[in-house]
Amino acid sequence: MSQKLILVLNCGSSSLKGAVLDNGSGEVLLSCLAEKLNLPDAYITFKVNGEKHKVDLSAHPDHTGAVEALMEELKAHGLDSRIGAIGHRVVSGGELYSESILVDDEVIAGIEKCIPLAPLHNPAHLLGLRAAQSIFKGLPNVVVFDTSFHQTMPEVAYKYAVPQELYEKYGLRRYGAHGTSYRFVADETARFLGKDKKDLRMVIAHLGNGASITAVANGESRDTSMGLTPLEGLVMGTRSGDIDPSVFGFLAENANMTIAQITEMLNKKSGLLGISGLSNDCRTIEEEAAKGHKGAKLALDMFIYRLAKYIGSMAVAAGGLDALVFTGGIGENSDIIRERVIGYLGFLGLNIDQEANLKARFGNAGVITTADSKAVAVVIPTNEELMIAHDTARLSGL
């Protein structure tokens, strides 16, 4: 009998991303992306054997309709009977979950309890989870939380300096994100360098449209840049990152903006997009900065400066630095950003190897610092889907 496959789902409020993986080899046999869910022109795109095709979802434009279309596609390729379990990415498990878990009614209630911590994401994850339970009847479901990896942070790192009853009553603290990526990359970095991860003090930068950075020591998260929500920390595609909280009062008073408007502005209209006035896409920002566009140049400069500053602070949290790791779409592909960031870090004993830095792109891992550097900087491609598949297989007994 052929080995059971794992279906991995990642649901957003208007999207559903899916992949069918062979847990042993990590091969992706089928992938899909549903977009514009809950709108009349919803659709889903499937990719199988390098071929793409689109299916209209206008008759059932919700998450359930997307999962139904996925089931039909699996049947068409004879894959439906080979699915052994389903793994779901969930943004926030709050303090309830420090590791991945097999889904039951109690877990669903727990994810619901964490909705205030991820109001944009957790409701969508629940829609996808319920759709999977109803359409893939009898299959085990596993949830993998973005926040779990950071539950090892010490109190000095996760607490905010506010009245403590706010933490006790409302769970107001730093939770972090991208934990599944950090767990995968920490393991891969140790394997790539031929070391035990418990012997490595790592600072890992997960850089994409959402960007964060984490200090890892003894294989565990010691501190991270994202906070109560993913808004804290680095300059991102559309998020401001760190900002003086009194900005809310200032804008309410002087610009007549509501809390909801300010929150949306800081999450969706700030970052690279807000500074440049052009785009949230780092590739566009790099191209336009090279052509002399002032806004793009400033956006790139601010992104790099904030990142370098955070690397220094995360080296403190890790107790030193053995390996600086770049991952995520920007971290894996932008040799320009990596070189400029490392240019700030000579005081940590890091020197860029320009040739190696150019080679470490498009899925290629590699050390990008010179042999005489006191620590290494390395590029390690992330694979959150594979990490979710591994957890799902383990917890469902496959």
Curated annotation (Swiss-Prot):
Q: Where is the signal peptide?
A: none
**What positions are marked as the site Transition state stabilizer?**
H178, R239
**Which cofactors, if any, are listed as required?**
Mg(2+); Mn(2+)
Q: How is the cofactor bound?
A: Mg(2+). Can also accept Mn(2+).
**Annotated Gene Ontology cellular component terms:** cytosol
Pathway note? Metabolic intermediate biosynthesis; acetyl-CoA biosynthesis; acetyl-CoA from acetate: step 1/2
Q: Which controlled-vocabulary keywords does the entry list? A: ATP-binding, Cytoplasm, Kinase, Magnesium, Metal-binding, Nucleotide-binding, Transferase
Q: Where does Mg(2+) bind?
A: N10, E384
MF-aspect GO terms: acetate kinase activity; ATP binding; magnesium ion binding
Catalytic reactions on record? acetate + ATP = acetyl phosphate + ADP
Record-level GO BP terms: acetate metabolic process; acetyl-CoA biosynthetic process
One Pfam family it belongs to:
Acetate_kinase
Class in the EC hierarchy, top level: transferase
| Principal location class | cytoplasm
Q: Does the keyword Magnesium apply?
A: yes
Q: Which residues form the active site?
A: D146 (proton donor/acceptor)
The UniProt family comment states: Belongs to the acetokinase family.
As for what it does, the entry says: Catalyzes the formation of acetyl phosphate from acetate and ATP. Can also catalyze the reverse reaction.
Instruction: Kindly give the PANTHER family that the UniProt entry links to this protein.
Output: ACETATE KINASE
- Name of the molecule in the record: Acetate kinase 1
